[in-house]
Amino acid sequence: MSCKININEIDPSVLSKLKSKAVLKIDNNGKPDNVILTRLINETAYIPFSMAKNFNLSIPLRNKFPAISTKFKGELRDNQMIVRREAIDILEKNHSVIISCFTGFGKTIGAINLACKLRLKTLIIVTRVVLMNQWKESILKFCESENKTIPIVEIISSNSKDEYVMCNFAIINAINIPKMEQGFLESFGTVIVDEVHLVMARKTFRSLLYVTPRYLIALSATSYRSDGLDALFPIFFGKEKIIRELNRKHVIYRVDTLFKPQVKYGINGKMDWNALLEDQASNENRNKLIVQVVKNNPERTFLILVKRIKQGEWLAKEIEKECFNRVDHLLNNLSIDDEQKEPKHVATLFGSNQKFDKNCKVLIGTSAKIGTGFDFDKLDTLLLAADVVEYYIQFIGRIMRKDDVNPIIFDLVDNNKTLQKHYSERLKVYKKHGGIVKNYKL
C-alpha cells in the first residue's frame, strides 16, 4: 500500500528526508541487510502508505474511487462489533489499521463488513489459492447487491482483462500484482491484506507499492515476522493495532515417545535439521504410537500435523485400517465396488491437494497447508506429529472454532535436546492462552 507522488512537486527538504528513509537496514538472523522501501518510475515515486502519511503527503480522496453497491447481510458477534468500532475510529483518523485477532475470531467476516461500511471498491491481497476461494465464498455468503450487472466478487489472475474492473470486490495473489495494469490497481479505494505476516515476506512485500488506496486493512492472527522484516509493519500500516489474543481452556497431553532421533552434522559443523525431521517422520514405532492415540480416542475429530508427506501417507493408510476397520465391508456382504464408494474416515491435505472431505474424522496435513487459510470447524483435537515452533498459535486456533467443544492437544516429545527445547517454547504458548498440561499414558 503506497502513496503516489510526483517528486518534482515535493518540497526539496521533504524529498531529502524521504530519500534518507528509502532504505531500511534490518538484522536478518544476525546478518545486516538493506531493504529498499520505495518504487520510482521516471518522476513518479510510490511511498509506503504510513510513511507517506507521516510526511503529510496527501491520501487519495474518496471521489477518486468508484463506490460499491454491496450491502452486508450477515450478523457480527458482540466481540466482533467492538473490534469493528475500534477499526472504524482508527481508519477515520489514520486510514490504516492492523487487526490482529486470534484464529477463529472472525477476521474475514469482520473485514467484509468494514469494506461494505467504507463503500469503496475493494481489493483483497492473499498469498495462497485456498485463501482466494475462501474469500470469494465468504463474500458471496455475506454480501448482496441491487446492481446485478456488476459482479459482487471476482478472482483476479495475471491473465485477467479490463472487464474485471467492473466488480465490487477483487481477490488477487500478491505475486500477480506487479503484472497488472496500473490503472486497474488504482481503481481500488480499500485494500485488505490477508495473512499480512506472509505478504510482508522479502519476495512479496514490494507488491504493496503498486496499489494506492484510501483505506488499508491488514489481517493476521500473528502479525509479526522473525526475519527482521517485522520493521515493515509500521512503515506500511502504521502503529495502530487491534489485538485480541486467544484465552480459552484447553488440555494438552504430553506424550513422551522415548524415540531418540539420529543427529547428523553438515560440513559447517551445524546439525542437519532436515535429516533429523526425516528420521522423526520415518520412525515406525513413533508412527504406531500416533495411530494408537487416535484409536484410543474414537469420539474426537483429529487434526494431525506433519512435515513430511510420506509420513502423512503412511499414517492415513494405517489409521484408516486400524481405527476404522476398513474390512468391515466383508461382514456386511458389500461388493468391492461398494467398498470403493464408501467414504473414508481419514482425509489428507498436503502436496497438490487443495480440498479434502469435510465428513472425515481425521485430517492429516502439512504445516504449510494448515498454518494459514484453513477452515474446518469440526476439529476438536490437535496431534503434533512433527516439530513446530513458529506461528504455533495459528495451529492451536484450528481446533477452537466452535464454542461447544473441549479442545485437546497431543504433543509428542522426543528424546532430543533441541526438540525438547522447542516443546518448552510451545509450553509457554499453552500456558499463556489457557492450556492445562498433563502427562499421557497409553
Swiss-Prot record:
Binding of ATP, residues: 101-108
Keyword Ubl conjugation: no
UniProt key word Oxidoreductase: no
Alphabetically ordered keywords of this record: ATP-binding, Helicase, Hydrolase, Nucleotide-binding
PROSITE patterns: HELICASE_ATP_BIND_1 (PS51192)
Record motif DEAH box, residues: 194-197
GO molecular function: ATP binding; DNA binding; helicase activity; hydrolase activity
Origin: domain of life: Viruses
Residue ranges of every copy of the Helicase ATP-binding domain listed in the record: 88-241
The protein's Enzyme Commission number: 3.6.4.-
InterPro entries in alphabetical order: ATP-dep_DNA_Helicase (IPR050615), Helicase/UvrB_N (IPR006935), Helicase_ATP-bd (IPR014001), P-loop_NTPase (IPR027417)
Family affiliation: Belongs to the DEAD box helicase family. DEAH subfamily.
PANTHER family listed in its UniProt record: GENERAL TRANSCRIPTION AND DNA REPAIR FACTOR IIH HELICASE SUBUNIT XPB, RAD25/XP-B DNA REPAIR HELICASE
Protein name: Putative helicase 161L
Gene source species: Invertebrate iridescent virus 6
